[in-house]
């Protein structure tokens, strides 16, 4: 959607060059226009060449900066002030209930823009930030109170990082912008692990309040509360109806105002359900990525045909995979084998979406954590019981930001495309986490499941709709209630397809080892290959 960044200098003033350099580093996140507040002076511009002469001339103690990817509103350039310019905002994100909030707030406030983000300023003035429904990371500078307030959405869909050093405090949407300060102000070595060790993540559902008078800050966690008794004593059919309705509402909120949206589609139940629901409200394009003969491509292709949805697919060659390994590592600001393997299909899908002129894609991220989709969830349920699995799912949801969401955001935004995740809507999460465990994990017999080695040339199988896929019967199923909701919209070969990790379904795991081997590193020496990647990332920075 956008990038935000800012610097608070603790003693002497600093030139605008550092803030503008950070904006340049984050430009891929928002190419439509940019804005910078430096103390009391504000500049808006479309091209960094327009501000070259100001980089050294402008100095100050505090900056807020923004690069915009315009999605909602034509006149949403930031930083945005309140009516008397005593409060300034920069925000990365989308506010899904902004129309309703705007209607309420305009009774006492004057709006300057048609941006969804502007409601944040006036909610802050009304002390009602908890009414926000959206995915966001923002910074507010309140001159009257002499504070800067950072905040992040409930589940951390939008990233926000910060550093606190002797000379300055700074924040940014991506760590690479903070590397620039650590290297050029603090003189830190170009060592990826060392640089990242100095950077902290603002946790989801948290606010950081920086007091400018004495250069200190405090963090307030859990400023919004989840209602986890939502589905208490509901029958299975009632729970299905609630979940179905909430998912449709969530998808509708995330495509409102869009004529066309992309879906990062693996051919699994999660992304396929989101695709089908989105197609009820706007045009949908599926983006599927994998290596030659990867399962995800085969399933996605069949799904697109059966549901009459447009599909763009990309088969990644070994040579291309090498290129994407480096691109993804650079995008996510870290070197982690699993994150790179999962990130490559996301990166390539968003690259294709950008080529098609799309600014928004949806994914099925979060469903496994909410409904018990991993093998370890079933194992915990069998061995340790329902209460332990409840705790595990809750922990997984709150850890999504560092395990998956920051990676996914960086991979899509590297291509100027915003990712939205309907499963992490607050109402959907409240319903999912309060659904009884036995509705998610159950003993079944004779339930059709698509096999891994599918054959599209085989004869149709009785009992499966719209498919020629081979099936087998299994005794247990994870994500039962979600699969049963999905079966109302999708062929059974998708609704009941077994879980397969993205890096395996796309064929990427094996390909990464091939890339490492090309550089002289065997599978046993994969960590040496990763170390080489780390050096390459920071050397090119």
Curated annotation (Swiss-Prot):
Residue ranges of domain Glutamine amidotransferase type-2 in the record: 2-213
Listed SUPFAM superfamilies: Adenine nucleotide alpha hydrolases-like, N-terminal nucleophile aminohydrolases (Ntn hydrolases)
UniProt keywords, alphabetically: Amino-acid biosynthesis, Asparagine biosynthesis, ATP-binding, Glutamine amidotransferase, Ligase, Nucleotide-binding
Active site residues according to the UniProt entry: 2
Residues that hold L-glutamine according to the record: 68-72, 92-94, 116
Reactions catalysed: L-aspartate + L-glutamine + ATP + H2O = L-asparagine + L-glutamate + AMP + diphosphate + H(+)
Entry keyword annotation includes Ubl conjugation: no
NCBIfam families: asn_synth_AEB
Family (UniProt): Belongs to the asparagine synthetase family.
Protein name according to UniProt: Putative asparagine synthetase [glutamine-hydrolyzing] 1
Species the sequence originates in: Methanocaldococcus jannaschii (strain ATCC 43067 / DSM 2661 / JAL-1 / JCM 10045 / NBRC 100440) (Methanococcus jannaschii)
């Amino acid at each position: 959607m956008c990038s935000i960044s800012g610097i608070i200098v603790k003693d002497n003033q600093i030139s605008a060059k550092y803030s503008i350099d950070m904006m340049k580093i984050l430009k891929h996140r928002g190419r439509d226009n940019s804005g910078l507040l430096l103390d009391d002076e504000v500049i808006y511009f479309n091209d960094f060449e327009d501000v070259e002469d100001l980089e050294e001339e402008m100095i100050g103690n505090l900056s807020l900066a923004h690069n915009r990817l315009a999605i909602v509103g034509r006149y949403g350039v930031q930083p945005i002030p309140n009516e008397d310019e005593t409060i300034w905002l920069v925000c990365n994100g989308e506010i899904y209930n902004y129309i309703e909030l705007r209607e309420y707030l305009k009774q006492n406030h004057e709006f300057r823009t048609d941006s969804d983000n502007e409601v944040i300023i006036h909610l802050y003035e009304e002390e009602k930030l908890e009414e926000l429904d959206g995915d966001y990371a923002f910074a507010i500078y309140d001159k009257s109170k002499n504070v800067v307030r950072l905040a992040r959405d409930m589940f951390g869909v939008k990233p926000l990082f910060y550093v606190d050093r002797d000379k300055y405090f700074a924040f940014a949407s991506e760590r690479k912008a903070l590397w620039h300060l650590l290297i050029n102000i603090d003189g830190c070595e170009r060592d990826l692990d060392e640089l990242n060790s100095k950077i902290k993540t603002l946790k989801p559902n948290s606010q950081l309040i920086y007091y400018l008078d004495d250069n200190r800050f405090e963090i307030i966690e859990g400023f919004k509360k989840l209602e986890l008794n939502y589905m208490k004593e509901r029958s299975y059919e009632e729970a299905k109806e609630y979940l179905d309705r909430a998912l449709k509402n969530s998808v509708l909120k995330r495509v409102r105002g869009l004529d066309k949206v992309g879906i990062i589609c693996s051919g699994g139940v999660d992304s396929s359900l989101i695709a089908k629901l989105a197609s009820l409200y706007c045009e949908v394009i599926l983006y599927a990525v994998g290596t030659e003969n990867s399962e995800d491509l085969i399933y996605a292709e069949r799904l697109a045909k059966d549901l009459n949805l447009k599909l763009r697919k990309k088969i990644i060659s070994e040579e291309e995979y090498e290129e994407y390994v480096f691109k993804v590592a650079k995008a996510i600001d870290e070197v982690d084998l699993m994150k790179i393997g999962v990130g490559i299909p996301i990166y390539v899908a968003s690259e294709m979406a950008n080529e098609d002129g799309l600014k928004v894609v949806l994914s099925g991220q979060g469903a496994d954590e909410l409904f018990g989709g991993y093998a370890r969830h079933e194992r915990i349920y069998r061995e340790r019981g329902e209460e332990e699995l409840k705790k595990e799912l809750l922990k997984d949801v709150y850890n999504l930001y560092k395990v998956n969401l920051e990676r996914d955001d960086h991979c899509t935004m590297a291509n100027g495309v915003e990712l939205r995740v309907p499963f992490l809507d607050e109402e959907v999460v409240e319903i999912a986490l309060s659904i009884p465990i036995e509705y998610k994990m159950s003993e079944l017999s004779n339930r059709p499941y698509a096999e891994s080695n599918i054959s599209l040339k085989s004869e149709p199988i009785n009992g499966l709709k719209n498919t020629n896929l081979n099936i087998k019967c299994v005794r247990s199923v994870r994500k039962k209630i979600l699969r049963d909701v999905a079966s109302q919209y999708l062929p059974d070969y998708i609704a009941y397809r077994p879980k397969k990790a993205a890096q395996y379904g796309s064929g990427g795991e094996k390909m990464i080892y091939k890339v490492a081997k090309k550089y002289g590193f065997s599978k046993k020496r994969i960590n040496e290959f990763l170390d080489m990647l780390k050096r390459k990332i920071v050397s090119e920075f």
